[in-house]
């Protein structure tokens, strides 16, 4: 996966995606989530790959180990660049996910979601019944992910630094919750700017609405890209 800001393609149709991508004349890294994938299926992935873009397929698989393994066998054939599972599924599920992926593709990176960046500490305690801080809950899931042999985690940039210190800088930290200065928070709770994310140890950042809903998406993307790579 190129070290570029990953644009979250939060659109409802393939036509909207291609209209957006047609504005750009350069290789991009993009994220396809559940909403878009369930609407468009593998056909959109193939068309985006033909354009030369890298793809993070963000489906957050979470099921029994055998089911996730078989699902990963199918996703491996799509030739995306990055896939993910939920760390809450446990070590065995994550190990089987990687095995399923490797049956057909040795190059796709696989990471695990720790806690969503929309999760608050109150929700963690009262709804998930995890009686630790968010930071400790995230770090615990990151430890399990590395033990399972995966390539990294999805986490808030606010947690990237502590994960790097314990699990190493080569362990991927893919961080949503990125907002340029002055941008709306939307439904994100644990956020930083691109510059802060880099300082904290994020290896990749995911940015959606500040680019896709911008009146000038190319300019917005290039400003974020410049601040991330500088």
UniProtKB/Swiss-Prot annotation:
Gene Ontology MF terms: orotidine-5'-phosphate decarboxylase activity
Catalytic activity: orotidine 5'-phosphate + H(+) = UMP + CO2
Record Gene3D superfamilies: Aldolase class I
SMART domains named among the record's database cross-references: OMPdecase
Pfam families noted in UniProt: OMPdecase
Binding site for substrate: 10, 31, 58-67, 117, 179, 188, 208-209
PROSITE patterns (UniProt xref): OMPDECASE
Keyword presence, Lyase: yes
Alphabetical keyword list: Decarboxylase, Lyase, Pyrimidine biosynthesis
Single Gene Ontology BP annotation: 'de novo' UMP biosynthetic process
Active site: 60
Keyword Lyase part of the UniProt annotation: yes
Record pathway: Pyrimidine metabolism; UMP biosynthesis via de novo pathway; UMP from orotate: step 2/2
Catalytic class of the enzyme: lyase
E.C. number: 4.1.1.23
Gene Ontology CC annotations of this record: cytosol
Stored PANTHER family: OROTIDINE 5'-PHOSPHATE DECARBOXYLASE
Function: Catalyzes the decarboxylation of orotidine 5'-monophosphate (OMP) to uridine 5'-monophosphate (UMP).
HAMAP family (alphabetical): OMPdecase_type1_B (MF_01200_B)
Subunit structure: Homodimer.
Family: Belongs to the OMP decarboxylase family. Type 1 subfamily.
Protein name: Orotidine 5'-phosphate decarboxylase
Organism: Staphylococcus epidermidis (strain ATCC 12228 / FDA PCI 1200)
Gene name for this UniProt entry: pyrF
